[in-house]
Every structure is written in C-alpha cells, then in structure tokens.
Regions:
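Active-site metal-binding loops of divalent metal-dependent hydrolases
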Residues: 8-10, 39-42, 67, 92-93, ...
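Beta-strand-turn-beta hairpins that frame and shape the catalytic cleft
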Residues: 1, 30-34, 129-137
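Hydrophobic alpha-helical segments and helix pairs
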Residues: 72, 77-78, 84-126
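Hydrophobic/aromatic beta-strand patches that form the interior of the parallel beta-sheet core
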Residues: 4, 63, 88, 123, ...
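Active-site metal-binding motif and surrounding structural segment of the metallo-beta-lactamase
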Residues: 44-89, 93-94
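Active-site-proximal loop/helix segment associated with metal-binding centers of metalloenzymes
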Residues: 99-105, 109, 115, 127-160
C-alpha cells in the first residue's frame, strides 16, 4: 500500500512546486484499488496529483471523513475530473457547520452545491459499510477519547 499526501496545510521545502491549502487529501494505492481520502477545501489536490504521479481520472472511489469544508469541498473538483468513482460519506441531517469564537462566526461546512450536483455519485452511509473488498467505512466513532479543545468552537445550525 502506498499513501501519498496530495494536499495539506504544510509546505515541503523539498517540493516548492506543490501547492498548499488548509485541509487534507490523501491518495491510497493498493495492488487493486486507487482511493482518495478527503479532497481538501478546493481543487488544489487535483493540481498536485500529476506532480505526484497520481491520475485523478483513475481513482476508483473516494471517502469524505467529515463535512468540514477543508476536507470535503474539493469533491466538486473531483467529480469534474473523475467520471466514474463514487464518493462516500456519513449520512447526516445536519447541513450547516460553523466555527464561532471571539465574536466571529464562519461557515465551515460542506458546499451545498456538492450535495445537489454530484451526478448521483455521492453515497451516504449510516453504519459500518464495506465499500470495496476489505475496505470499510466506520461511521460510529466512540467517545472514549477526549475531543480536541478547538472543538468547543464548532457547532451545527441546529445547536444554536
């Protein structure tokens, strides 16, 4: 298995040719499968992919870890550059996610255009699901561990 970071928050001194954006996108390649885990906040991962020998058009499936813009809004670009792969994410009735601190409020949720214009390729799951042979999405993450302190500033529209 090979995991390639297509985009994240940090610039590599050894790779000034790679663009940086807030967010994350990983390409995971196995002997039989090409997958994306998250797609960053925009199309930057698509710009970086050819520089890292990754063909977005050949990706078999994609997974969105959660509905914050810096992990999922690049999916709009993904469906433009890849005509076949499904994009999997956890079902949620919540549509709007916000960050609020020090008098500022910012929408940090999924772009509603993605939910409307995904050509039927957005697949919602609500339980542990095998999405490819031996590849599972786990939707129920336990609360056994303390959440990051920054989460105190995150909420959904229905919470406030």
């Amino acid at each position: 298995m090979k995991i390639t970071t297509l985009v994240d928050n940090n610039r590599l001194d050894s790779r000034p040719d790679l663009a940086v954006e807030r967010g994350l996108s990983l390409h995971i390649k196995t002997e039989s499968l090409s997958m994306l885990f998250d797609m960053g906040g925009g199309g930057t991962f698509c710009q970086n992919a050819p520089l890292l020998d990754v063909e977005i058009k050949d990706v078999d499936l994609a997974v969105i870890s959660h509905r914050h813009h810096d992990h999922c809004n690049g999916a709009i670009d993904f469906v433009r550059h890849n005509s076949n792969a499904n994009v999997f994410l956890k079902h949620s009735d919540e549509r709007s996610y916000y960050f609020r601190a020090y008098g500022f409020k910012n929408n940090v949720g999924i772009n509603p255009d993605l939910l409307k214009n995904s050509s039927g390729r957005l697949k919602f799951v609500n339980k542990t699901t095998e999405i490819a042979r031996n590849v599972f999405i786990i939707t129920d993450i336990c609360d056994k561990y303390e959440k990051p302190k920054g989460n105190q500033y995150l909420y959904t529209k229905s919470q406030h």
